[in-house]
A protein has these predicted regions:
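Metallocofactor- and cofactor-centric catalytic cores in central/energy metabolism, strongly enriched
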Residues: 2-146, 150-164, 168-173
Length: 174
């Protein structure tokens, strides 16, 4: 997609924030045949199939610890349920993530707010006029983001004044 054929999205807040990002449910389909087929292809398709094969070996190895590392806003892009399912079904042993993934994205949606599909070509000045933030092609309602920040501040204000590790603070968030 380029700027010329990018979707024409409205000029008011409601028209910009009209298509929520949907999180993938990896339990709703069987991707094995697709991944196996990719092993006979080229470029990154074959690499993806090889990575899946290695991952399967890791899951089968009782002496292997699997760390999932996340950077950026992949949970806002629709991967949040994937991460939850990987933990739920013991497919990862640990997650190392940036604060954006845990605080600004997961906690934001835990409060009932949503991320919305948008366009990376949208004029940021127009978005700013409507109090909308953009992460590449994903939109966030700035009013809701500020509500999230206030909620975190209110929780922080109830804590005993001392230094907290990231884990301790995230635990306090719930």
């Amino acid at each position: 997609m380029n700027k010329k054929n990018s979707p024409k999205i409205g000029h008011n807040k409601k028209s910009f924030l009209n298509k929520p990002v949907e999180h993938i449910d990896i339990t709703s389909f069987d991707a094995r045949k697709l991944i196996e087929s990719m092993s006979k292809m080229s470029f990154t398709s074959r690499d993806t199939a090889k990575a899946a094969s290695i991952y399967n070996e890791m899951i089968s190895d009782k002496n292997c610890s699997i760390f999932l590392t996340l950077a950026g806003s992949t949970s806002a892009a629709g991967c949040m349920k994937i991460y939850a399912d990987l933990v739920k079904y013991n497919m990862v042993d640990a997650i190392v993530a940036t604060g954006a993934s845990i605080i600004d994205m997961d906690f934001f949606e835990a409060l009932g707010f949503k991320h919305y599909q948008g366009s990376q070509f949208q004029d940021d000045t127009e978005l700013r006029k409507n109090y909308i933030d953009r992460i590449y092609d994903t939109y966030i309602d700035e009013d809701q983001l500020q509500n999230c920040d206030r909620t975190i501040g209110e929780i922080a204000d109830t804590l005993e004044p001392k230094a907290y590790t990231s884990r301790e603070f995230i635990y306090e968030l719930g």
